[in-house]
Amino acid sequence: MSDLQRTWAKAKFGASNDPFDEPQEEQGQDVLPELPEPVDDDSSSASSASSVSSTGTIIPSPNQKLFARPQGVARGRTLEQIPWTTYFEREVSLKSEQDPEVIYHAYLTSPVGKGPLFVMHHGAGSSGLSFAVVASQIRKRISTAGILALDCRGHGSTYAPEDKAFDMRLDTLSSDLYNVVQLTKTEMSWPEMPPIVLVGHSLGGAVVTDLAKSGKLGTSVLGYAVLDVVEGSAIDALQSMHTYLSTRPLGFATLQAGIEWHIRSRTIRNSISARTSVPALLVFNENDDPTRPWRWRTNLGATQPYWEDWFVGLSKKFLEARGGKMLLLAGTDRLDTELTIGQMQGKYALQVFPEAGHFIHEDLPEKTAVSLVDFFRRNDRTALVLPPKVSDLIKQGKRV
C-alpha cells in the first residue's frame, strides 16, 4: 500500500482503528498462560454488538475490520494448545442402555444450586470444545451456571462402531443429545433437571431445534438459541461444500500448523478459541502421509447423505417449538422468507454480529455470552413475580 493510500485510509477510518495495520493481539506472548483471558479479538466492546428488532440493513462501524486481509500469526504469538481443563470442571463418558455400543463424550461444569444448564451442540466437523471459551464467559456473568458440551457421534472423543459413527440422521442426533442430558443427570445424581437453555451452532442448531420441538425435555427447557444457521441459506451453501472440502489441507505437519491454518484462513478469527478447539479436530496418523500426520478426525464427506435432512423444515420447527427463541447470525442476508416474516411478527429474538465469521461463538465469545446470558434472564421463570391469588387475599381479610 502506498503512503498516499495509507494516509487516506487513516483519515477515513481514524488513526486508532486502521484496518490495514497488522494485528497486535497477544503481541510478545511466547508462553502459554495458565488461565488465558478469553476475549473477543475484535476491538469493539461487548456493548457494541448489533442488536436488531427488525430486518433492516445494518451498517457496520469502521473499526470492525470486516475487510482486513487474512493474516498469519503475529511474531511472538504462541500457538500452544490450551487444555480443556482451563474451561471445564470435568469430562464425562456416558453409555446408554438403548445403544450400549456408543459411548458419548462430553465436557461438563455442573450448575450450582438452582443455576441454569446451558446444553451445547456443535456443528459438523467440530467438537464440544468449540464452546469452551464462550462457556467461560457465560460463567463470568452467571457464576452458578452449568455448561454441558457434548461431542456428537463421529466427532471428538465420542466413540461409536464404524457402522454407527456416521448414522448422522437428524432424529438420531436429536436422540443422542436427549440421552446425553438424561445420562448426565443420572451420572451426577442431580435430584431434578436444572432449567435448560439449548444452544446449537450450524448443524447443532438443527439438532437443538428438533429436540425442543419434540418436547422430550418437558418444561425444563426455558428456550433455545441457534447460531448462524437458517434453512434457506444452509441448503444453498451445501452446493459449495464439496469445493470447500477439496480446497482445505488434507493434513498438517504439526498441531500448531493446524491451529495457524484456522487463524490464517480466518476460519476461526480468535486465536484463543483456535488454540482451544482446533486440537480436538485433528488426530495423529502418519500412515497416509508421514510429512502431514495430523489428519482431520471427522470425515465430513461421509456425512453427505444427511446434509439436506439436517436443514429441511428447520425454519418452521424453529418458529413452532415451545420456549424462548433466539437466532444469532453473522449477517441479515442469511434470513430466509419464513424467518423474516417471523421476525417482523416478534416471534423470536434476533442478534446480528456482522464482524464475525460462521463460528460466531468462537470469533466473538464475549459478545455471544452476553447475548446468551441476556436470553436466559429474559426467560428465567424464577425471576417472575406473580400477583397474589384473589382467594388468598380474601382469606387474609383484604378487600378485592
From Swiss-Prot:
Protein name (record): Protein phosphatase methylesterase 1
Entry function: Demethylates proteins that have been reversibly carboxymethylated. Demethylates the phosphatase PP2A catalytic subunit.
Active site annotation, chain numbering: S202, D228, H358
Keywords from the named record: Hydrolase, Serine esterase
Ranges of Polar residues composition bias in the record: 55-64
UniProt entry tagged with the keyword Hydrolase: yes
Chain intervals with Acidic residues compositional bias: 19-28
